[in-house]
A protein has these predicted regions:
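Divalent metal-coordination and catalytic microenvironments
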Residues: 18, 57, 70, 99, ...
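Non-cysteine beta-strand/loop elements that form the S-adenosyl-L-methionine
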Residues: 69-71, 191-193, 349-354
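Histidine/acidic-residue-rich, glycine-tolerant segments that coordinate divalent metal ions
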Residues: 84-94, 100-101, 116-236, 240, ...
Length: 389
């Protein structure tokens, strides 16, 4: 793919521009305009405002009914960058997860494929807000799907990638490409549980309904539930908020417990959701207080489809060479909202080695520009193999 290599400098500079001008989830207005402008320049049909700030590019060639989708995320994180290079972030947030590179890499493939021969339809999904949810608790992928992106832009298969610092793939640092059959990444749910009691003076607890005591019982019950009823899932209490540090004689009205749950089975995540609600309501009833359980995040496990996996595996071996691919690495307990696409359409998710960079979400992280060529080559191979005559 010599012509692809000739595009490297152009998209390296584009990646640096996107990095320097990051935008948070559902606010990727300028990034989306840039993506749309580039796709139009390359000859794609362009559809904007899908999933609020998402963009879809469509390229049809030949007469085949076959179709394939590729996805990249566009949003940045609310982190102050600590790098001092010339293209460091300007906006008080930063691309600390490499979505600048994902976007530039898919655009690089888009330009290459615009001049390639294939038979079918290519749909490119540039997604907002992988890192956050909107007021309806919908992430960017979920919002695009709710906006009927997959109904309007039908695909037989959909594929996505993420860069991964080698330090986060211990034991596989020398590989370029990582993918596994079945469960790739965990699903995640987050909860805020508010116990509303009756505050008062610490000298008269009998006149109060102490929410701290109730919330403490709830936390203990959660960890008992965790040890007795869960198999592969991880449940952690990550916050306990109550009272004030400005006085010692006040029993507060409310106590809040924050919970993070990660699991490899969507069925078990649903079971955990049911049990958290049951336990919270049961303890609140036992101590005669009120309780509100709010789910703050709900991302399903990322599960690679077997059929799509076989297609992706062949493309990866062609792109990287079999010795540079790892197909048996352990699943990760991190989560990825690409799972929403995989819940609707056959597809796979994979990692590409970002080399010796700082870890994801670190203020000194930077996307490795060499991954632009690796990602665009993999994406292009997927398309040309599947949409061949």
């Amino acid at each position: 793919m010599k012509n692809l290599e000739n595009l490297y400098q152009e998209f390296k500079e584009l990646r640096h521009f996107i990095h320097q001008n990051p935008e948070l989830g559902f606010n990727e207005l300028n990034t989306a305009k840039l993506v749309a402008s580039k796709l139009k320049e390359f000859g794609y049909e362009v559809y904007e405002g899908i999933g609020k700030t998402g963009v879809v590019g469509v390229l049809k060639k030949g007469s085949s009914a076959k179709s394939i989708g590729l996805r990249a995320d566009m949003d940045a994180l609310s982190i102050n960058e600590c790098n001092n290079f010339s293209y460091a972030s300007k906006n008080g947030c930063m691309h600390a997860c490499g979505h600048d590179g994902h976007t530039a890499g898919l655009l690089m493939a888009a330009k290459y494929l615009a001049n390639a021969e294939f038979n079918g339809t290519l749909n490119l999904f540039f997604q907002p807000a992988e890192e956050c949810c909107d007021e309806e608790l919908l992430s960017g992928a979920m919002r695009m799907i709710k906006d009927k992106a997959l109904e309007r832009f039908r695909v037989d298969y959909i594929y996505g990638i993420h860069n991964m610092p080698s330090s986060q793939m211990k034991g596989y640092e020398n590989k370029k490409f990582f993918m596994k059959r079945g469960v790739m990444m965990a699903g995640v749910s987050a909860y805020r549980v508010d116990f509303i009691g009756l505050g008062g003076h610490a000298s008269a607890p009998h006149l109060c309904k102490d929410p701290i005591s109730v919330a403490n019982n709830f936390v203990n019950a959660l960890y008992t539930f965790k040890s007795l009823e869960l198999k592969d899932s991880v449940l952690n209490v990550t916050g306990f908020l109550a009272g004030t540090t400005k006085a010692f004689n006040i029993i507060p009205n409310e106590a809040t417990v924050m919970i993070n749950v990660r699991g490899l089975s969507n069925d078990e995540l649903s079971f955990i959701h049911k049990r958290i609600n049951e336990i919270a309501k049961g303890i609140a009833a036992a101590f005669n207080v009120e309780v509100n359980v709010k789910r703050a995040e709900n991302i399903k496990a990322t599960i690679n489809n077997d059929e799509a996996y076989d297609i992706a595996k062949n493309a990866a071996i062609k792109s990287f060479g079999e010795n540079d691919c790892e197909f048996n690495h352990p699943h990760l307990m991190g989560s990825e909202d690409f799972s929403a696409f995989l819940d609707e359409v056959k597809g796979t998710y994979a990692f590409i080695n970002n080399g010796d960079s700082a870890n994801l979400h670190h203020p000194e992280y930077d996307f490795n520009d060499e991954v632009l060529l690796l990602a665009s080559k993999y994406f292009s191979t997927l398309v040309l193999d599947y949409l061949k005559d």
